[in-house]
Design a protein with these regions (language model features):
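Acidic helix N-cap motif at the loop->helix transition within catalytic regions
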Residues: 15-18, 44-54, 94, 98
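A conserved acidic beta->alpha catalytic loop
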Residues: 23, 42-50, 67, 90
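Conserved donor NDP-sugar-binding/catalytic core segment of glycosyltransferases
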Residues: 100-130
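Glycine-rich, basic loop-to-helix element that forms the pyrophosphate-binding segment
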Residues: 64-81
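Catalytic core of nucleotide-sugar-dependent glycosyltransferases
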Residues: 203-211, 216-243, 264-274
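Short, well-formed alpha-helical segments that are part of the catalytic scaffolds
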Residues: 13-28
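Short aromatic/hydrophobic "clamp" motif used to bind/position activated sugar donors
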Residues: 86
Length: 302
């Protein structure tokens, strides 16, 4: 019987952590078709988070001091994981009961399997489903196909949100960067490099988006911007075309973040360094007038 290790990092989340823990621990067919190992690493919470975690059947660890991001905890979890396959969860993710049992049949053949997911936007109350359609119920990606997609910062192709991934223990040797402590771009490139993968065409977890998400945090966006530029430089000799495309898209992402946060001066600055297309042109024009309408009606960022 296969064992699944789930690595969950936490910090000051006592209002939501019980629901997250229960959604992982109460998976369909657990102890019948697979074993489950839930590893929780807390980043020195000062609320009731740890108290709640310790009421559950989990392996618990804590960082020695607050690190300001999840990556140190993820690496601790990887070190202590003993499963055949590994998932990484965020503290505000909620798993559907059939998540593992839907992914497991494909894990033996493919080193990386992903799925679709639900997005619950707690800020603007606009919910959505991110899932691909395929008559077979899954989509196969050739060796290095998803690596190239990630390197180019393309939104097409396989879904690679961290919470959607289950991967083989053979890939646990790849660890997360701890200098910035929160960025996963280089880690995704490492695990998908020279690997084939599969995506299940089902939404199997809920990704909550709100003002506290790192993806909408200014400090995180700054770290992600500079670390992404540093990361793509390493691949320039082998993939020059893809790196040039990534550079433009990284600047475009930076521009849209400032657009979303109403800093239109910086938004214009970064739009001018991003891809030259109609979408960028209209975004740039709307920084002068119409941005509120755009933000209400389109998914600008995230």
């Amino acid at each position: 019987m296969y064992k699944i290790s789930v690595i969950l990092t936490t910090y000051n989340c006592d209002r939501i952590i019980k629901k997250t823990l229960d959604s992982i621990l109460n998976q369909d067919e657990v102890d019948k078709k697979f074993k489950l190992e839930l590893i929780v690493v807390d980043d020195c919470s000062i609320d009731r988070t740890v108290e709640i975690i310790k009421t559950k059947n989990v392996l618990f660890f804590s960082t020695k001091k607050n690190t300001g991001g999840p990556n140190k905890g993820r690496n601790i979890g990887l070190k202590h994981s003993s499963g055949d396959f590994i998932c990484i969860a965020d503290q505000d993710d909620y798993w559907k009961p059939n998540r593992i049992i839907s992914l497991l049949p494909f894990c033996e053949k493919y080193p990386i399997v992903t799925s679709g997911f639900f997005v619950v936007n707690n800020k603007n109350k606009k919910n959505s489903v991110r899932v691909k359609e395929n008559n077979e119920g899954f989509i196969y990606y050739r060796k290095n196909e998803t690596f190239i997609k990630i390197l180019k910062k393309s939104k097409k192709g396989q879904n690679t949100y961290l919470g959607s991934i289950i991967f083989s223990k053979k890939l646990k040797k790849f660890i997360f960067e701890e200098y910035f402590g929160a960025v996963d771009y280089d880690w995704l490139l490492k695990i998908f490099y020279q690997n084939e993968s599969l995506e299940i065409c089902k939404p199997l977890y809920v990704r909550n988006v709100n003002d506290k998400n790192l993806s909408l945090n200014e400090a995180y966006r700054t770290k992600d911007f500079f670390f992404s530029l540093m990361t793509i430089e390493k691949y320039f000799d082998d993939y020059p075309t893809e790196v040039k495309k990534a550079n433009l898209r990284i600047h475009g992402s930076r521009a849209r973040y400032y657009y979303l946060t109403n800093n239109m001066v910086l938004a214009r600055f970064y739009f001018l360094q991003s891809e030259k297309n109609l979408k960028t042109f209209f975004y740039y024009l709307s920084t002068f007038i119409g941005s509120n309408w755009v933000k209400r009606n389109f998914n600008v960022f995230g």
